[in-house]
Regions:
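Hydrophobic pocket-lining residues within nucleotide cofactor-binding pockets
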Residues: 150-152, 201, 228
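Short alpha-helix
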Residues: 182, 237-248
Length: 297
């Protein structure tokens, strides 16, 4: 009976995944092929327990393990397709892109290799940082990214991070884990204000932003892509607080429609996905949209 329940659960999960391929703009023309690729890569990762090097999007290379979100670049065309495609429309060669919580490098590789941005990538967990570094070394760059093995907070010092949670390691609330050096966003941006920032720090967004109030006030920073999924509650922070802070600094939340290439203002956050676009300079961002992407998967 237990086996039947397990198989039923897995079948429902695979079916749900297939339905997502039918709506993904990059796989909806052939969702069955995407499903085959999904099953194949997961067989290699979970059953054979291999590390696999994938090649995607005009030749980008990345080594992946089970649990990595970046695996989506193999079976789904792109990991976090909506946000990735938006950034591919937005970013231009020479733009400054700050990837906070880079993990093994999805957005670092996308911004630096496809769009040829000048990237600074921040990843606090040493083992994850090593994988990020290896993925960077596996590719040829026009502008070599700056990689920082530190965390960010509202003040400089040290914090304890978990290190046994695969791709979701974060600041430890129990005090157990590894000590990591942390700086503030304002320190990191003291020499150059980035054009665009991506933040994914597993609930610690409030503290990262409060360490960068001067940076947030600078008009050169035009857009922040930030993950808001209620995980700030682990640190007694509500998403509403983060949104109000960003609004106070001139960043308003929007949803981008890939088909019409238009922006719709929203009051809160994008509830259809984890990441939300907060835009300070809508005219500038809108002026970048509309070009046809050259994609080879």
């Amino acid at each position: 009976m237990k086996i039947v329940k397990t198989l039923s659960k897995k079948y429902k999960y695979v079916l749900k995944r297939y339905q997502s391929f039918k709506t993904n703009p990059l796989t909806k023309s052939n969702p069955f092929w995407a499903l085959i690729k999904y099953l194949y890569i997961n067989f290699l990762l979970y059953v054979l327990k291999r590390e696999v090097t994938i090649t995607y999007l005009n030749g980008i290379k990345a080594k992946v393990k089970k649990g990595d979100g970046i695996v989506g670049n193999y079976h789904s065309g792109l990991h976090e397709a909506a946000d990735s495609l938006f950034l591919m429309h937005l970013l231009r060669e020479g733009d400054s892109f700050l990837d906070i919580g880079a993990n093994v490098g999805h957005y670092t590789l996308l911004a630096g290799l496809y769009s040829k941005c000048k990237v600074t990538a921040i990843e606090p967990i040493p083992s994850t940082f090593e994988r990020l570094s290896n993925n960077v070394k596996s590719n040829n760059w026009k502008y070599q990214p700056e990689l920082l093995n530190i965390g960010l907070s509202n003040e400089s010092g040290e914090l304890v991070f978990t290190n046994q949670q695969f791709t979701t390691n974060k600041v430890s609330t129990s005090g157990h884990g590894i000590k990591v050096k942390v700086k503030t966003l304002d320190e990191i941006c003291s020499q150059q204000i980035p054009d665009f920032i991506k933040i994914d720090v597993e609930g610690y967004e409030w503290f990262v932003l409060n360490g960068g109030l001067n940076t947030l006030s600078n008009p050169n920073l035009k857009l922040i892509l930030i993950e808001l999924n209620e995980s700030g509650k682990n640190f007694n922070i509500q998403d509403e607080q983060i949104i109000e802070l960003l609004k106070d600094k001139g960043f308003l939340p929007y949803v981008f429609d890939l088909e019409t290439k238009t922006f719709a203002a929203i009051d809160f956050k994008n509830t259809n996905q984890f990441n939300t676009l907060f835009i300070k300079d809508l005219d500038f961002v809108s002026s970048r949209i509309g070009t046809t992407l050259e994609l080879q998967f």
